[in-house]
C-alpha cells in the first residue's frame, strides 16, 4: 500500500467555484436570486451570467493572479461576482462600502487591483478613491440597480468608467470554459481585516480552504437542500462567511438585500419563506426592537457571531420565532469554525441558563481540525476550568495562506503549527470555548471591527490632545461603541468639547469608527513602566452604562 500515491484522477484541485456549475445542472430551474420587485434568476441563468462576465474579464486581459475588487452591497451583481471573478482566474477582493475614500485607495494600491466593480451608490466613493492614486488605477466597471430609485441612472462621469456590468454580460461568450485553478492552494479571495492606512492586513485564502469552509458551514448549521437565505450579512464581511458558495452547493434561493431595514426584512421573510439568515448581534437587536414585527408563522434560523447577544435580546428574538445559533471565526478562518453546538438536554434549563450557555462560542465545527487555549509564554494548554485565560489558537484547512506582502505578520500569526488569533479566552470543563477579551484591542460595533489604535492615531492628530486611549463601551443596540479617554495639553486657551472632538473624528474616519463617547481626564492610568492600563478604562466605560437606547 505504501506505493499508492495521489494521481491526477484522485487529486484534482478542490474549488468552491464548481458548486455553481453543479447547481445549474441539478437545480437549473430553481430560483437562485430574488431582489426587489422584479429581479428573479434561476440557477441556470446565474451560471450563464457568471460565465459571460468571466469571459469578458478574460477578453480585456484579466487573468491568473490579477486582483479584481468589488465595491457593492448585497445585490445580485455582488453575489454573481463571487463566482464570476474566480471563474476568470482572478483573485476576488470584496471591499467594505462603509470605508472612506482614503482607506479604499490605500487598499486598492496595496493589493494592486486591476479592475474595480462599483455599485451605483458607491460611485462618488470610488471616484474620490481613484483620484488619490497617482499610478496604475484599476479599470472601473459601473453596476446599475434598476430596483432602486436613481439606481439605473447613467454613470455620473462616464469618462472614468470603461464598462458597465451589463456591457460585460452582453459581450461575454456563452461557450467560455471557466478557468480552473492549477492547484487547490492557488489564491481565490483577498479580504482586509480592517481599514487601516498604515499597515493593511490583506488575508489571502485558497480554493481548498474556501471549499472546505463552505461545506463545513452547511454541515454545522444543518442547512438542507433548497434553503431560502436572506442576505442580512454583508458579503464584503469575510465573503459572507463563505455562504455565497455554500448556498449554491445546496441549490438555495438568495434573497438579496441592499441595506438593513427591519420592517422590510419581516416582509421578505413572509413573502419568500426565508429559512436562514446571518448577521452580527446588532441584527437581533434591530429585529426585536422594532415596533412593526409580528410573530413568525414558521421558525427562521439566525446564525450570529462576535460579541454574544445579551440575554434579554436572545429571549426577545426567540419569542418572535427566531432560532438562534452562535459561533466564532475570523477573517483569517474564512468563516465560523467554532460553534455553540446545542445539546437537547439544555432545552429543559431555565431561560437565563440557556442564554448563558448560548453566549459561549462553543467547540470546533465538524470540518475543522483543532482549537485550543494556550499559555502565551509556555505554549501549553491552559486548565479547562472556565477561569484560566490564554490565547486562542487553531488549525484547520480553512486557515488563511497568510497576509499579503506581510511576511513578518504571517510568521507571527502562523507558528508552531497553529494560527494564533490574538484573542483571549477560556475553555470550560465541558470543552466549550468562551472569549474573554481581544488582546489586539478590537472593538466590535454592529458587526464592524474597529481597531482602537486607528482611532487613537486620528485623535492624536488633534493639536489639543496630550494623551488618548480608546476602549469599548457597552451599547444596547450596537453591542459595543468606541469610547475615548482624552487628556488635554496644559495651557490651552480654549478646551475642545466632547461634541467638537467627535466631529473632528467624523471628518477623518468612517462613521462606524467614530467614538460615541469622549471622556476628558487629567491623566490616563498607567503601570509603573508607563503603559496605559486599558483594563481600568474598560471598567470605567462599563460602569458608564450603555451608550444610548436609540439607533443614532
Curated annotation (Swiss-Prot):
Residue ranges crossing the lipid bilayer per the database entry: none
Function (record text): May act as an acid--thiol ligase that activates carboxylic acids by forming acyl-CoAs.
EC class: ligase
Organs and tissues of expression: Expressed in roots, stems and developing seeds.
Keywords tagged on the record: Fatty acid metabolism, Ligase, Lipid metabolism, Peroxisome
Primary location: other
GO cellular component annotations of the record: peroxisome
Motif Microbody targeting signal per record, residues: 550-552
Name of the protein: Probable acyl-activating enzyme 5, peroxisomal
Family assignment from sequence similarity: Belongs to the ATP-dependent AMP-binding enzyme family.
PROSITE patterns attached to this UniProt entry: AMP_BINDING (PS00455)
EC code(s) of this entry: 6.2.1.-
GO MF annotation terms: ligase activity
Example GO biological process: fatty acid metabolic process
InterPro entries in the cross-refs: AMP-bd_C (IPR025110), AMP-bd_C_sf (IPR045851), AMP-binding_CS (IPR020845), AMP-dep_synth/lig_dom (IPR000873), ANL_N_sf (IPR042099)
Entry superkingdom: Eukaryota
Subcellular location: Peroxisome
Amino acid at each position: 500500500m505504501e506505493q499508492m500515491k495521489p494521481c491526477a484522477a484522485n487529486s484534482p484541485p478542490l474549488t468552491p467555484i464548481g458548486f455553481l456549475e453543479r447547481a445549474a445542472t441539478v437545480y437549473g430551474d430553481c430560483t437562485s436570486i430574488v431582489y426587489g420587485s422584479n429581479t428573479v434568476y434561476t440557477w441556470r441563468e446565474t451560471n450563464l451570467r457568471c460565465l459571460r462576465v468571466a469571459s469578458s474579464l478574460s477578453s480585456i486581459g484579466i487573468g491568473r493572479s490579477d486582483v479584481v475588487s468589488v465595491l457593492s452591497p448585497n445585490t445580485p451583481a455582488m453575489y454573481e461576482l463571487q463566482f464570476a471573478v474566480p471563474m476568470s482566474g482572478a483573485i476576488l477582493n470584496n471591499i467594505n462600502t462603509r470605508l472612506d475614500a482614503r482607506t479604499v485607495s490605500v487598499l486598492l494600491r496595496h493589493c494592486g487591483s486591476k479592475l474595480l466593480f462599483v455599485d451605483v451608490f458607491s460611485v462618488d466613493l470610488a471616484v474620490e478613491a481613484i483620484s488619490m492614486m497617482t499610478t496604475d488605477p484599476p479599470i472601473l466597471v459601473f453596476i446599475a440597480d434598476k430596483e432602486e430609485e436613481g439606481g439605473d441612472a447613467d454613470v455620473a462621469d462616464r469618462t472614468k468608467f470603461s464598462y458597465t456590468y451589463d456591457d460585460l454580460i452582453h459581450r461575454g461568450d456563452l461557450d467560455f470554459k471557466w478557468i480552473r485553478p492549477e492547484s487547490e492552494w492557488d489564491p481565490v479571495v483577498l479580504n482586509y481585516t480592517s481599514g487601516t492606512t498604515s499597515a493593511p492586513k490583506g488575508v489571502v485564502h485558497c480554493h481548498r480552504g474556501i471549499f472546505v469552509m463552505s461545506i463545513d458551514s452547511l454541515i454545522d448549521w444543518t442547512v438542507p437542500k433548497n434553503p431560502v437565505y436572506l442576505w442580512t450579512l454583508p458579503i464584503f464581511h469575510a465573503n459572507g462567511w463563505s455562504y455565497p458558495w455554500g448556498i449554491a452547493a445546496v441549490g438555495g434561493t438568495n434573497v438579496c438585500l441592499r441595506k438593513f431595514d427591519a420592517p422590510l426584512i419581516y416582509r421578505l421573510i413572509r413573502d419568500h419563506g426565508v429559512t436562514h439568515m446571518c448577521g452580527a448581534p446588532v441584527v437581533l437587536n434591530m429585529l426585536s426592537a422594532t415596533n412593526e414585527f409580528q410573530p413568525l408563522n414558521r421558525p427562521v434560523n439566525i446564525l450570529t457571531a462576535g460579541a454574544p447577544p445579551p440575554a434579554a435580546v436572545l429571549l426577545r428574538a426567540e419569542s418572535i420565532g427566531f432560532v438562534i445559533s452562535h459561533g466564532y471565526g475570523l477573517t483569517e478562518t474564512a468563516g465560523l469554525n467554532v460553534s455553540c453546538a446545542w445539546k437537547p438536554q439544555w432545552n429543559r434549563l431555565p431561560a437565563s441558563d440557556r442564554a448563558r450557555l448560548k453566549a459561549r462560542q462553543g467547540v470546533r465545527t465538524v470540518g475543522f481540525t483543532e482549537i485550543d487555549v494556550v499559555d502565551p509564554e509556555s505554549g501549553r494548554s491552559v486548565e479547562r476550568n472556565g477561569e484560566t485565560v490564554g490565547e486562542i489558537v487553531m488549525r484547520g484547512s480553512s486557515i488563511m495562506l497568510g497576509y499579503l506582502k506581510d511576511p513578518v505578520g504571517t510568521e507571527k500569526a502562523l507558528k508552531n503549527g497553529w494560527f494564533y488569533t490574538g484573542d483571549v479566552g477560556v475553555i470550560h470543563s465541558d470543552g466549550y470555548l468562551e472569549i474573554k477579551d481581544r488582546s489586539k484591542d478590537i472593538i466590535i460595533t454592529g458587526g464592524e471591527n474597529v481597531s482602537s489604535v486607528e482611532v487613537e492615531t486620528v485623535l492624536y492628530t488633534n493639536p489639543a490632545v496630550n494623551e488618548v486611549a480608546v476602549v469599548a463601551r457597552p451599547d444596547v443596540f450596537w453591542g459595543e461603541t468606541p469610547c475615548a479617554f482624552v487628556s488635554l495639553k496644559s495651557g490651552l486657551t480654549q478646551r475642545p468639547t466632547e461634541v467638537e472632538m467627535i466631529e473632528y473624528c467624523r471628518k477623518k474616519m468612517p462613521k462606524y469608527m467614530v467614538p460615541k463617547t469622549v471622556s476628558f481626564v487629567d491623566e490616563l492610568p498607567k503601570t509603573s513602566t508607563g503603559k496605559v492600563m486599558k483594563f481600568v478604562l474598560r471598567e470605567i466605560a462599563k460602569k458608564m452604562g450603555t451608550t444610548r437606547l436609540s439607533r443614532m
